[in-house]
C-alpha cells in the first residue's frame, strides 16, 4: 500500500438489526454461563418486524428463560414502542434450540495430542491485529467509527437528543500521510429519528444536521484531524423506519465491524453467541491479545497474527506473525516469542483470558477490541515487559 492514501471503516449502533441479534445471542450465552460455565453454546438469532427467532445448539444444565432474556435485551437497546417496528413487550419470540452434536462434542472433549485435552470446536483460521494509531492500539478509522455510534446511543438514552431512535450507522474515511493518520476526510453518520426531523423525504431539517455534527461528531473526533472534513448526515434523507423493521437482523453479520474495520484480514468466523471452546471467538480474542502485547512491547508498530486450528486438535496448525516491516526484530523471531509466552491451545486460551464467565453481552456492540473494559482481558498488556526482555530490548 502507498504511504499516502485514504482508508475507510464503518460501525453500527446497538439498535442496528444485526447488532440486536448479536446482543440477544450474547445475552443468552451470559445467562447460561451465570448458572453453568461449562455449557456448550452456539446461539443464533434472527430479528424482523415484531419477531425474534432463537435457534442453534445448546448443551447445558442451566435453566434459562430464553424468551425473557430476548425481551430484556430489546428493552435495554431501546425498542420499547410499537412505532419502532419491534417492541419488547409485544414481539413474538420463537425458540428452536438443539443440543450440540455428539460427534463434535467427542472431538472437543477428548483431544488426543495434549494433556490440556480440550480440542478446538471447529477448524478455521483467525487473525489478531494491533497498531500504534491510537492509545488503545487500534486502527483509527474503526476506533472512531465505534465512538460515533456509541455517543449516538448515549445522547439518545440520556435525553439530550430525544428525537434519535436506536438504529444508526457511522463511517470514517481517514487520510494517511507517510503511512500515519493525518486527518479525517469524510464522516458519514446515518441515524434513525422521529418523523418530525425531516423537511421532505430526501431532506433533513438543518437543526437536525447541526445537532448531529456539533453534539455527536465533533466531541468524539480529535480536533486536529478535522481539517476540511466533509460531513454526510443522513445523506438519503428521512430515516424513520429502521431496526428490525427496516432490515432483517442476523447474528454474525457484522464481523468486520466487530474486529478491525478491514485493516487486516478476517478468518470468516463470527463471535456472538459462541462459548469459548469455539476458536472462532476465543482464538480471535487471543490473537488480539498477542498482537497488542507485541506492539505495546515496542517489538513492532503494527502486528498481524494468524492462527489456525483443526477440529478436535488442541495445538494450532500455525502461528504466523506479520509486521509489515515495522518490527525491530525479524517476524519469525517474534513468532517464536509468541510460542514461548502464550498458550494458544483452546483450554490454554480459556485459562489465560478467564473466558468461562458471563462477560459477553458487553462485547456485542461497539467492537470486541480496543475497549478498556475490566471484562476484556484480551486487551491487557501484561505480557509486554516479558516480551521486550526476551527480545533483548
Swiss-Prot record:
Q: Which UniProt keywords apply?
A: ATP-binding, Cytoplasm, Magnesium, Metal-binding, Nucleotide-binding, One-carbon metabolism, Potassium, Transferase
Cofactor(s) recorded for this entry are:
Mg(2+); K(+)
Free-text comment on the cofactor: Binds 2 divalent ions per subunit. Binds 1 potassium ion per subunit.
Q: Where does ATP bind?
A: 16, 167-169, 238-239, 247, 253-254, 270, 274
User: Which residues are listed for L-methionine binding in this entry?
Assistant: 57, 100, 247, 278
- Broad class of where this protein is predominantly found: cytoplasm
**Entry similarity comment:** Belongs to the AdoMet synthase family.
Indicate what this protein is called per its UniProt record: S-adenosylmethionine synthase
* Organism annotation: Acidovorax sp. (strain JS42)
Gene name of the record: metK
Amino acid at each position: 500500500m502507498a504511504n499516502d492514501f485514504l482508508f475507510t471503516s464503518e460501525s453500527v449502533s446497538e439498535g442496528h438489526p444485526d447488532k440486536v441479534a448479536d446482543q440477544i445471542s450474547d445475552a443468552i450465552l451470559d445467562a447460561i454461563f451465570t448458572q453453568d460455565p461449562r455449557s456448550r453454546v452456539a446461539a443464533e438469532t434472527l430479528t424482523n418486524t415484531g419477531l425474534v427467532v432463537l435457534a442453534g445448539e445448546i448443551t447445558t444444565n442451566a435453566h434459562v428463560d430464553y424468551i425473557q432474556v430476548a425481551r430484556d435485551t430489546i428493552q435495554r437497546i431501546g425498542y420499547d414502542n410499537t412505532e419502532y417496528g419491534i417492541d419488547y413487550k409485544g414481539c413474538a419470540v420463537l425458540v428452536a434450540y438443539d443440543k450440540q452434536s455428539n460427534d463434535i462434542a467427542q472431538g472437543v472433549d477428548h483431544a488426543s495430542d495434549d494433556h490440556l485435552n480440550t480440542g478446538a470446536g471447529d477448524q478455521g483460521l483467525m487473525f489478531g491485529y494491533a497498531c500504534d494509531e491510537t492509545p488503545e492500539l487500534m486502527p483509527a478509522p474503526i476506533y472512531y467509527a465505534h465512538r460515533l455510534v456509541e455517543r449516538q446511543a448515549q445522547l439518545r438514552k440520556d435525553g439530550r437528543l430525544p428525537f434519535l431512535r436506536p438504529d444508526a450507522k457511522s463511517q470514517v474515511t481517514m487520510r494517511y500521510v507517510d503511512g500515519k493518520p493525518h486527518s479525517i476526510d469524510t464522516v458519514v453518520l446515518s441515524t434513525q429519528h422521529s418523523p418530525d426531523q425531516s423537511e421532505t423525504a430526501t431532506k433533513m431539517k438543518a437543526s437536525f444536521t447541526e445537532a448531529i455534527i456539533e453534539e455527536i461528531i465533533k466531541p468524539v473526533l480529535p480536533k486536529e484531524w478535522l481539517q476540511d472534513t466533509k460531513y454526510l448526515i443522513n445523506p438519503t434523507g428521512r430515516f424513520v423506519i429502521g431496526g428490525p423493521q427496516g432490515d432483517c437482523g442476523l447474528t454474525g453479520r457484522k464481523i468486520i465491524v466487530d474486529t478491525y474495520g478491514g485493516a487486516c484480514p478476517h478468518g470468516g468466523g463470527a463471535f456472538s453467541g459462541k462459548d469459548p471452546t469455539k476458536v472462532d471467538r476465543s482464538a480471535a480474542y487471543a490473537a488480539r491479545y498477542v498482537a497488542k502485547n507485541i506492539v505495546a512491547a515496542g517489538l513492532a508498530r503494527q502486528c498481524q497474527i494468524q492462527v489456525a486450528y483443526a477440529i478436535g486438535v488442541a495445538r494450532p496448525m500455525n502461528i504466523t506473525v506479520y509486521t509489515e516491516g515495522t518490527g525491530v526484530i525479524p517476524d519469525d523471531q517474534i513468532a517464536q516469542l509468541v510460542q514461548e509466552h502464550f498458550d494458544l491451545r483452546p483450554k490454554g486460551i480459556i485459562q489465560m483470558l478467564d473466558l468461562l464467565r458471563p462477560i459477553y453481552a458487553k462485547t456485542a456492540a461497539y467492537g470486541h477490541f480496543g475497549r478498556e473494559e475490566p471484562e476484556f482481558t484480551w486487551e491487557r498488556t501484561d505480557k509486554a515487559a516479558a516480551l521486550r526482555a526476551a527480545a533483548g530490548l
